[in-house]
Amino acid sequence: MAAKEYDYIIIGAGSAGNVLATRLTEDRDVTVLLLEAGGPDYRFDFRTQMPAALAYPLQGRRYNWAYETDPEPFMNNRRMECGRGKGLGGSSLINGMCYIRGNALDYDGWAERKGLENWTYLDCLPYFRKAETRDAGANDYHGGDGPVHVTTSKRGVNPLFEAMVEAGVQAGYPRTDDLNGYQQEGFGPMDRTVTANGRRASTARGYLDQARPRPNLTIVTYATTDRILFSGKRAQGVVYLDGQAQITAHARREVLLCSGAIASPQILQRSGVGPGGWLRDLDIPVVLDLPGVGQNLQDHLEMYMQYECKEPVSLYPALLLRNQPAIGIEWMLKGTGIGASNHFEAGGFIRTRDDDPWPNIQYHFLPVAINYNGTNAIKMHGFQAHVGSMRSPSRGRVKLRSRDPREHPSILFNYMAEALDWREFRDAIRITREIIAQPALDRFRGRELSPGAELQSDAQIDAFVRARAETAYHPSCSCAMGYDDMAVVDGEGRVHGLEGLRVVDASIMPRITTGNLNAPTIMLAEKIADRIRGRAPLARSTAPYYVANGAPARGAKHVEHAPAPSVAAHTH
């Protein structure tokens, strides 16, 4: 049977791939094949649709690739979880639904790199707005008619949220009313990708539901990509598996690789693009020796600081089996109640030292004491702060183990490999204890359950981090944008040295952003979609944004930053 032809083949129906599939098929004469190794996102599967059930997909393999790292040398040689989404929606189908864009200086930092000058925050902000419909309405920072439904936290959901934010302010840190607005730094309510009727707002819902009826879009699920086909240095198509059958599809224009920070470098390497020595070790014909493929891997590591709650206001009763049917019925029939929230409704970003130019620590507050993946629940009323560093200098890698497309790659993050990692985690634990000790939490705060008040010395804190810190599920940067020797793609996602091939997902970030990665991944896909379509970029924003400029980390005064005329004159 002759191979079918499409203008574009997209590998991976995740946070980025669904954006591209939707935007490219807005042009009716463009045909797109969207390949997804997982299955559909079933609308009536509470595990992926109910926000409060966010831990369930991580406990199985229907929606989770369930990768595992190699023994991490600085973490007691633990093999650590690396959950990634499998199915329409990708990781937006199983993530924690925290809508955090990152700090303005993340993007300004990207733009300081040669060739990435049009990735400033003010260049990116219009694409964040384009993607978003925020329930509180549009403004200079937020959109009102985009595919991603964003819900703001409402007062009165749980007294612990407001108390934890107030405790951060009492400890001397700023208050912010919008972690995605003028000022990220500080404590405040957290936006979430949840619809108005209490359902998860994955990209399969927001984007793909628009595009699915279009005759120029073909979606194939349970399609595991084997390799990208090349004619010389030009990508010409894809070989994928349907059961045991190998199927070939050809791309007239481009192949768009959107498989995430683990699978994108894995597929490139299996296709003959990557470090030449690695490829030759597996007898893979080298299409292009590109040393950065799979390198520069980054993630956020975090700890759970858990406390007993003296008042019965936590979510502990919701963990009891006898209470769950009523929660599920209310959510199913009304879209309200405990089931309709991811319960990460407050958080914050702080600088631990005055010389940090922008926040280096993130907080997620949760009114229950439990691991992110639903394990190790404390059998009492409790609450916790997830706390972790944002820009670790440690770097890892993704390396192919075999030519078998069903075998997971070798993954090593090298967590906590640098001295700065240890300093920031020690600071974070001690600062968190100061915050929790504030008067706002007096009526709720019981004993410290984890790490435990007896752990005070650097050595004790370090031992706790080695044994208990976990991934925040933010792998990124393994096919980095740029023009240095280790860069994989240019500023439009085009793979250096090849034609007809782009990578568009979190792997192309040159440096991890400050916070959760779903919103930045959607933004960069929106931005690159315009370039693929040959459309003029959206006009650069002129919205001001906060920069600390050396202000004290505690008690800092606001300093507005707007583009200087010379910066504003830059064009894409």
UniProtKB/Swiss-Prot annotation:
Q: Name one GO molecular function term.
A: choline dehydrogenase activity
EC annotation from Swiss-Prot or TrEMBL: 1.1.99.1, 1.2.1.8
The EC class name is oxidoreductase
Is Signal set as a keyword in this record? no
Q: Which residues form the active site?
A: H474 (proton acceptor)
What's one Pfam family the UniProt record gives for this protein? Answer: GMC_oxred_C
Q: Which UniProt keywords apply?
A: FAD, Flavoprotein, NAD, Oxidoreductase
Under catalytic activity, the entry for this protein gives:
choline + A = betaine aldehyde + AH2; betaine aldehyde + NAD(+) + H2O = glycine betaine + NADH + 2 H(+)
Name the domain of life this protein comes from: Bacteria
Q: Cross-referenced SUPFAM superfamilies, in alphabetical order?
A: FAD-linked reductases, C-terminal domain (SSF54373), FAD/NAD(P)-binding domain (SSF51905)
User: Which GO biological process categories is it annotated with?
Assistant: glycine betaine biosynthetic process from choline
- Residues that bind FAD, according to the entry? 7-36
Question: Which prosthetic group or cofactor does it need?
Answer: FAD
- Supply the InterPro entries for this chain: BetA, FAD/NAD-bd_sf, GMC_OxRdtase, GMC_OxRdtase_N, GMC_OxRtase_C
Q: In which pathway does it act?
A: Amine and polyamine biosynthesis; betaine biosynthesis via choline pathway; betaine aldehyde from choline (cytochrome c reductase route): step 1/1
- Report the GO terms under cellular component: membrane
- The family this protein is said to belong to: Belongs to the GMC oxidoreductase family.
Name the job this protein performs.
Answer: Involved in the biosynthesis of the osmoprotectant glycine betaine. Catalyzes the oxidation of choline to betaine aldehyde and betaine aldehyde to glycine betaine at the same rate.
PANTHER family given in the database record: CHOLINE DEHYDROGENASE, MITOCHONDRIAL, GLUCOSE-METHANOL-CHOLINE GMC OXIDOREDUCTASE
Query: Which protein is depicted?
Result: Oxygen-dependent choline dehydrogenase
Tell me the organism: Paraburkholderia phymatum (strain DSM 17167 / CIP 108236 / LMG 21445 / STM815)
